[in-house]
Every structure is written in C-alpha cells, then in structure tokens.
From Swiss-Prot:
Source organism superkingdom: Eukaryota
Additional comment: Present with 2840 molecules/cell in log phase SD medium.
Residue stretches of each Solcar repeat: 9-108, 120-204, 213-300
Identification of the protein by name: Mitochondrial 2-oxodicarboxylate carrier 1
Transmembrane segment boundaries: 9-29, 78-97, 126-146, 179-199, 219-239, 281-301
Annotated organism of origin: Saccharomyces cerevisiae (strain ATCC 204508 / S288c) (Baker's yeast)
Length: 310
C-alpha cells in the first residue's frame, strides 16, 4: 500500500507540473473548446420565420455532435484543433498562476482570516481561487483573443501571428487586451467555484490513505468543481467570446455587464449559456484530469528530488 507523499517542492517543480497537466488536458479536450466558441458566437435570430430559417441554414449548430460533424465534414478534422498554438503557449504561465498563485494567496488570506492551527476554510479557498483567477486573466487575455479569432467560423486568419499583426496595426498593442474585463470575470468566478468546491468535496469524501484513493478523490472533486465553475462563469464566457471576436472603434459588445444584459434582451436567458454543454464536457472531466496529472507529476518530482518515500 502506497502512502500519500506531501513533501514540499520548489516553485519550478510546481510550474513544470502545472504546465504538463495543462497541456495534457488541452490536447485531449481542445475540440470541445472549438465547439464551445462556435456555439457562443452564434447569434440567436429573431424575426420572420423565413428569415430565421434562412440564417439558421448557414453554419447553424444545434448541438455538440452536430457542430463536431459539420466542422469535420466542411472544414476537415484539423479544424477541431484550429487556434491551439495560442493556448499551448499560455498553458505554462496559466497553470503556474492557477496552482502556485492559489497556494500563495492561501498563505496571504490565512494571515487576514486567522484559523486554529492555520487550517483552511472554504472562505479562504474561495478568496484564494478568485484572486489567482484575477491575476491569471491578465496573462491569458491576449492568448484568448488570438484563439477566439482563429476559432471563429468566419475567420480569415490562418496563423496566430496574422491575428497579432492585424490587431496591433489597427488598434495598437493594448488592443490585444480587448475583453480583459470579461476575462477577469470569467476566471474569478470559475476559480472561486472550482477551488471552493474542491475544498468542500474533499472534506465530504472519505479521507484518502493511498495514492489510488487520492486519485479517486481528485477526479471526483475536480469534476464537480469544474461543473460548478462552468455554471458560475458561462454568461461571462459568452460575452467574452463576442467581445474578443469584434474589432474596431464601433463594437456591439464592449463591457461585460451591459453585454450580458444585451444578450439576455435580444436572445433570451438560454443564450447566456450557449456552449455550456461542450464546456462542461471539457471542464468537468478536464478539471479532474488536471488534478490527477498535476498530482502524479508532483509525486514523480518528489521521488526524483528526495528518493522514493519509504
């Protein structure tokens, strides 16, 4: 029976483990991210039935499988991975902030909200996750903008460099941070839900005494945490996608809250959860996969640094 190994490791090990976990999850789940973006950018049409039918016939996606099938048939299998270069490049800093940043903020909030023996509480878990999410947003926003513009079905861009050049020429370097405010909302809410729920679920599950039991708990907690995170942040993810797709001085979608209200008024409440199914299908199991890979890579690094635990 293998006991759980919690020996501490320096930041560089956490950084590397987070990057490996993030890229592993990305390679497996990325097609669902493309589907999510396509569905979020799809505007619900209102008006005369004939007009609605005509517009719906043009690349209208009715669900996850319908979208996957149409992308493969019309554009080719490779388009399920369109825009993946940008998220791969941002995975290392993104995951480093998500995990090590969360740990750093936990230490900070434990000083503000002292607990007996420095124990964790759900409040600290939520605050730490939200704070790490806010910092994370500043890192990922430009990469997200590039990814969204490449994933768009109407995109004329072929490479990330084309997107960057076009954005900088038209709007300057700061235009790469278009949608930053919406990205902050998205990451704050998701991380708060994810880490807050993981903390609570781990308390409810039977205490893990072996590495196998820890993997089981991580899968369950990560999947539930990922689902809750999606429920909280999808409306802001929808408007983020639309804000980042647009360019130029006159844009329909600008700030998050007015954009959420605009989507609600024009398309109804359901439109705020467009792409929810592929998002949950990715981030629920993906959240579990992320924790499992991260934990196992960290255990491997501990063996390399300290030797096998007796």
């Amino acid at each position: 029976m293998t006991s759980i190994d919690n020996r501490p490791l320096p930041f560089i090990y956490q950084f590397t483990a987070g990057a490996i976990a993030g890229v592993s999850e990305l390679l497996v789940m990325y097609p669902l991210d493309v589907v999510k973006t396509r569905m979020q950018l799809q505007v619900t049409t209102k008006g005369h039935p004939a007009v609605v039918a005509a517009k719906a016939a043009v690349d209208h996606y009715t669900g996850v499988m319908d979208c996957l099938t149409k992308i493969v048939k019309k554009e080719g299998f490779s388009h399920l991975y369109k825009g993946i270069t940008s998220p791969i490049l941002m995975e290392a800093p993104k995951r480093a902030i998500k995990f090590s940043g969360n740990d750093t903020f936990q230490t900070f909030y434990k000083k503000i909200f002292p607990t007996p023996n420095g124990e964790m509480t759900q409040k600290i878990a939520i605050y730490s996750g939200a704070s790490a999410g806010a910092v994370e947003a500043f890192v990922v926003a430009p990469f997200e903008l590039v990814k969204i513009r490449l994933q768009d079905v109407n995109s004329q861009f072929k490479t990330p460099i084309e997107v960057v050049k076009n954005s900088v020429v038209k709007g300057g370097v700061l235009s790469l941070f278009n949608g930053l405010e919406a990205t902050i909302w998205r990451h704050v809410l998701w991380n708060a839900g994810y880490f807050g729920i993981i903390f609570q679920i781990r308390k409810l599950l039977p205490a893990a005494k072996t590495s196998t039991e820890k993997t089981r708990n991580d899968l369950i907690a990560g999947a539930i945490g990922g689902t809750v995170g999606c429920l909280l942040n999808t409306p802001f993810d929808v408007v983020k996608s639309r804000i980042q797709r647009s360019s130029g001085p006159l844009r329909k979608y600008n700030w998050s809250l007015p954009s959420v209200l605009l989507v609600y008024r024009e398309e109804g409440f359901k439109a705020l959860y467009k792409g929810f199914a592929p998002k949950v299908m990715r981030l629920a199991p993906g959240g579990g996969l992320l924790l499992v890979v991260f934990t196992n890579v960290m255990d491997f690094f501990r063996e390399v640094k300290y030797g096998k635990k007796q």
